[in-house]
């Protein structure tokens, strides 16, 4: 089988069309590329125009309630297409499909429901759909990693791509729905990962991001020879060795699992980007225990100190939840003081959203009033804005190597791209193309951007 026959979407006006909308995490973006690969092999072509689609798919997220509410709103929009054109198929795939299962089929809202481990069955499910017989497959697998399927890349710039190195999660944090929607943790054969990264580099890609719910627990066990087992640090090294011109990123790390070996490997290879996304969720050890995060405040701060001692220029970003069950004002203050201590580059910040079926939904009341959650979240957001600015100000005067991603949104005469530490730089164009590397000098900053000059 030729794994890499079509790395970009096929353009063919004669093929039936599939339209894919993706919600949620980077893993879902990569899953949509796997889905497209499977459907392209069945004779379909991707379209960006919903009006011409024969199949409309939403690849969904369940991490918070508002993510699901958005999809319910979109289903109403999709059904307009169904009324306009007979034979249009509407499918919900991904985590919301896994969580809600047959509820999505009630009232004939959609024709197709497929969970994250059921994408290989999509062609058969589509063939079996009739007006009276919608199709569903939400079986979770202990083996499926889609390792033999080459994703068809849907990115717009042709230089940055995602590679899924594992699926599922074994951590079962009390607030999180992911283990129930994506199943148990499975690591992918490292040789297929390296081959995929090599193929991307051969096709002009300059950056790959290795994806997993918890990349640090990646572990490939060789069935015959234990000396051929591969952990995450070893996998990182294998991908980094493809070429010094290929940047390697990864996400997401877990504070309890990020090892000294991973940090040391990053230090050895310059093309492994100096950025770690390390979700803290709360600065309170009491809350962390209740969340089942399996580390405390001191452990987290020690890991940050270790990263900075080995990689002083490493960007660190995080996730923070405001208003988890039973969170006191002191717990909230603990989060704020931890943020001030670490000075994160940026953060994803959310008010706690109780998810049905999780341990927290069964064990802990969602007892922080909406107004209080909102107040705490707004304090966290305001503080992070100041911390982002403080972090960026340390970059002033530095020279950074940047990968050009495209024109600046605000000024088409300027370019933008990220430095190794994941900070976004804006700088004057000097005729560079997307995918070129260039060195810039940081002259001034905002909380979100480094404004840079060019080296003459």
Regions found by a protein language model. Name each.
Residues 1-219, 231, 261, 276, ...:
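Proteins enriched for Cys/Gly/acidic motifs involved in redox and nucleic-acid/cofactor modification
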Residues 5, 360-456:
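Terminal RNA-binding accessory module
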Residues 28, 64-67, 97, 255, ...:
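Alpha-helix N-cap/loop-to-helix initiation residues
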Residues 90-94, 202-330, 340:
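Conserved SAM/AdoMet-binding glycine-rich loop
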Residues 120, 171, 216, 285-286, ...:
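Glycine-centered loop/turn positions within well-structured domains
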Residues 155-159, 169-171, 272, 282, ...:
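Short flexible coil/turn linkers enriched for glycine and charged/polar residues
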Residues 173, 193, 210, 250, ...:
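Conserved, mostly hydrophobic/aromatic
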